[in-house]
Regions:
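Eukaryotic partner-binding/assembly regions in large regulatory complexes
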Residues: 200-258
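Extended, amphipathic alpha-helical scaffolds
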Residues: 246-395
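A conserved mid-domain beta-alpha-beta active-site/ligand-binding segment of alpha/beta enzyme cores
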Residues: 162-219
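N-terminal cysteine/histidine-rich coordination modules
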Residues: 1-85
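A short acidic/basic microdomain associated with nuclease active sites
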Residues: 79-96, 105
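Catalytic cores of nucleic-acid endonucleases
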Residues: 117-171
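Conserved catalytic cores of phosphodiester-cleaving nucleases, focusing on short active-site segments
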Residues: 76, 102-121, 132
Length: 395
């Protein structure tokens, strides 16, 4: 904590005070947590920044606080202050029994900025987020950059904890992270799942001299050539080895393919196409697209029709049986979870496999399985041919 109450009830902030001046204050003044009312101790050691600490834990935020979190809060508070936002540090909201790291108001709206360092459970994070929103407060979640587990290449591991921080931006979904030392924002953009647990990303950084609008709205252009090369390699590798993964036995969608006498490598080249907002669906992109192909194209004649509502009903039913799984944080954000499905059907329509007539899709062609001896070459050729179309889907 940087802010505590004195015995008289006044708020006392440590920011801007020297360690020398705090020595006398520490000896003469008692301090209490503004949230829970318990006594706190003023620590002014040589290694850490001056801060207040509970003798036990605080029931409002029982996860405690690290030096990294203290520094991050300090930098973020000062960043907002320099922009004229008049922020309040460690603002306690008694109705919610929550303490925002930084609270501020702008243009009649209330905001709570949370710098999340501890890997809390998804349910706890979701509860805090929902409490803010119910009270008319817009939460801004920023994650500690080192919590993003990077892998070799442009990938990170997509845990439930990390998926909570995915937000929809003007140009692409993104995760906003922060490094306290040296202080900077790290923004992960153009997020596309290449498997159930791995995300492709592009990255950009912002020093604290950048303002709020630039940090949240700026986004580098999507390098589609680099991405498609990565996508082709990763999907090809998954198609070959997916049945050897430990999770294969627990993947109902994979079992559905085998039940239809289809090996993943033989799936049509039109299955396994990157589309925007696929992060909403936890199931592997190849698998949920394969299910749509099986249900709405392979088993129906040319000239047959189906509606988006029928697709939604099928996917909802598939969710109950475990065939398709959605990322819960994305659902909680209020976005349309079927957006990637609509984009995929639009892609198939533009490739000539369907015609949109009113609110129905008319089947005009059926994607065919690939030959066993040429599947890789056919996929690679198709992706190159459809590069421009895929790019339009992301804009």
């Amino acid at each position: 904590l940087f802010v505590a109450k004195t015995r008289s009830g006044e708020l006392f902030s440590l920011l801007g005070r020297s360690k020398d001046s705090l020595g006398k204050i520490k000896r003469e003044t008692s301090f209490f947590c503004p949230a829970c009312g318990e006594p706190v101790i003023l620590k002014t050691g040589a290694k850490k920044v001056p801060h207040f600490s509970h003798y036990r834990h605080c029931p409002v935020k029982p996860e405690g606080e690290t030096e990294t979190h203290l520094l991050g809060k300090k930098w973020l508070f000062e960043w907002l202050e320099k922009q004229g936002y008049r922020p309040q540090l460690e603002y306690f909201l008694p109705d919610l029994q929550q303490r925002a790291d930084v609270f501020f108001e702008r243009a009649g709206k209330k905001y709570a900025l949370e710098f999340q360092c501890s890997p809390l459970s998804l349910s706890l994070l979701a509860d805090r987020d929902e409490s803010y929103r119910r009270s008319g407060i817009i939460p801004i979640w920023i994650v500690l950059d080192s919590r993003i587990r990077k892998e070799k290449g442009p990938f990170f591991s997509a845990t439930d904890f990390l998926s909570f921080f995915i937000r929809e931006g003007p140009a692409s979904p993104f995760i906003l992270a922060f490094r306290p030392d040296p202080p900077m924002f790290v923004k992960y953009v153009h997020l596309v799942p290449v498997s159930k647990s791995r995300f492709y990303y592009q990255k950009t950084t912002f020093p604290l001299s950048c303002g709020m609008k630039e940090v949240f709205r700026s986004c580098p252009p999507f390098d589609v050539s680099e991405f498609l090369a990565v996508w082709q390699r990763e999907v090809g590798r998954w198609l070959i080895f997916c049945h050897l993964q430990r999770s294969a036995k627990r993947e109902p969608a994979l079992h559905a393919l085998y039940a239809s006498a289809i090996h993943p490598t033989l799936l049509p080249k039109e299955v396994g196409i990157p589309v925007p907002r696929m992060h909403a669906i936890e199931t592997h992109p190849v698998l949920w697209q394969a299910l749509i192909w099986l249900e709405f194209f392979r088993q129906r004649p040319r000239g047959g029709t189906f509606s988006m509502e029928e697709v939604k009903t099928y996917l909802r039913r598939s969710e109950k049986t475990g065939l398709v799984r959605w990322r819960k944080p994305v659902l909680a954000e209020g976005r349309d979870p079927f957006s990637p499905v609509k984009k995929y059907l639009l892609f198939l329509a533009k490739c000539g496999f369907a015609r949109i007539r009113g609110n129905r899709y008319v089947i005009e062609g059926i994607p065919e399985p690939l030959p066993a001896d040429r599947w890789r070459e056919e996929r690679e050729k198709f992706l190159k041919e459809q590069k421009a179309l895929i790019l339009t889907l992301f804009h």
